[in-house]
Amino acid sequence: MRQMTDKKFFNIMLVCIIAVTLIFFCADNISRNGGFFGKKNQPVLTEELRELFSTRPAYGLGINKELKGEITVQIFFVDDDESNWDAESISLFMKPIKEGLRFIEKQADRYGVELEFEIQYHASTVSGEKDKLRYKGSVLDGSDGTHTHDMMEQLADNFGYYSTRQLYESYKYQSDGREVVFVAVVNKDGISTARQQQSADYGGDYVEHAIIFTNYIGRNLPLDKKSDRASTVAHEVMHLFGAPDLYIKRAVERYTSYKYPKDIMLGDTDDMRRLEVCEYTAYTVGWVDAPPELE
């Protein structure tokens, strides 16, 4: 009789634990992803969020100041110790590059901003550039906490310049004074990143650039397969002109997921038609002069 009582008590406690766990899980899921019957709950708009969405801390810093007018995009198809490019791979990857840049042009037009990118590319398949696109070592993607910081330094040296700043000034002169964007593309899986100037403390010699991998780490998709590559290109180029990630802090992600679920700085997708540049991101890159009204 005593054993039966203990067993019943154990079963009751087990049921209670499971029930409480489910209640907490459901409550958190409802809070984060929407209310009952599919109606989303609006996240609390704190003073901290209001202050955050009224600033654009990286706008106008570094070499990439104005995301408007005519801009030259210098694409470097970089080989390293683990990967290389051939003519076919370059041709395939030029498609998402063009699509990503077209997306930004169309979004600028939505805000009444004239923007046109001109693409120039460099690759080991081009005559005279074979040894100039070799990165000494392996390009690191940050997945293990380490990043490649000397990409532009190596490229500047390979092309015969004394510094990254001299490289930049040369390409700016060749582009008749237009803005110049530097993008290095590596033919392997990895986490793409933008080496963006975050504050005036970096000094005037800092040359912003993006390092883009052909696939997000672990996907290993052939270049002719549909992927989120175009949105990655657009996302990283927007970074270079001051657009911040909208998914770093949970409170920011919750609010932007509710307010601006399609924003390019919140996520990526293989269907660019599902993305846009929201009012806040437009403000951070200078397309509008005032921050958005928040509710």
Question: Where are the model-predicted features located?
Answer:
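Propeptide-to-catalytic entry region of secreted or membrane-anchored zinc metalloproteases
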Residues: 34-177
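Catalytic Zn2+-binding segment of zinc metalloproteases
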Residues: 237-252
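Hydrophobic single-pass membrane-insertion segments
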Residues: 25-37
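Short pre-active-site segment immediately N-terminal to the catalytic Zn-binding motif
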Residues: 211-233
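N-terminal Sec-pathway targeting helices
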Residues: 2-16
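Auxiliary, metal-adjacent structural segments of Zn-dependent hydrolase domains
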Residues: 161-207
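Hydrophobic membrane-insertion alpha-helices, especially the h-region
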Residues: 13-25
